[in-house]
């Protein structure tokens, strides 16, 4: 019998008497082959997948926290597995996803345009609605133009990876969001990490940069994992001192 989570000092130490059998079963599901045919004659990737059963063990223990299906509106209270529970993880701070006006507009847009775009925005997936939205946002924030993305992760992935070149620099906080880190990895620029919210560390990294090269400082506004706020006044001060540009991911 599977031991309860509270009895295990660490998740990876859960005692599963049938652990090996479970792993074999999971491996056979991944490989779409009968358990009887399961053997060691697997390629390295399949073998690696077969050995990784932590998610299945977490599900069996009832502590797997991901991909829980919600069967209700996105409100402060939602229904999961038939139970009404409080939602503390929502990004919908305004509640607009359930605003009757937004719902009606979405219905009308579906009637006119269909249920989705038939291509990427770069080719044939840009609708007049997208351009109208970009124009209204640009007017609202007082900028010449804006570019909208479908996700916040996509913004940082797309922008951070393309703004700078091979001989330029990206300076980033060690607690930056994963999307910033992935965008930095895709860039060909030189990457310099500074200690979390440590302005002395940031300045030392700025001093390492060649003066005539582009320097992009990328930081969260509110750090999503810790909840603390970036020292933007000091970051801007240093950016002016070393002729750098600041990019802020203001997601929260």
Model-predicted regions and their roles:
Residues 159-178:
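Conserved PLP-anchoring active-site segment centered on the Schiff-base-forming lysine
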Residues 166, 186-188, 242:
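Short, structured coil segments at secondary-structure junctions
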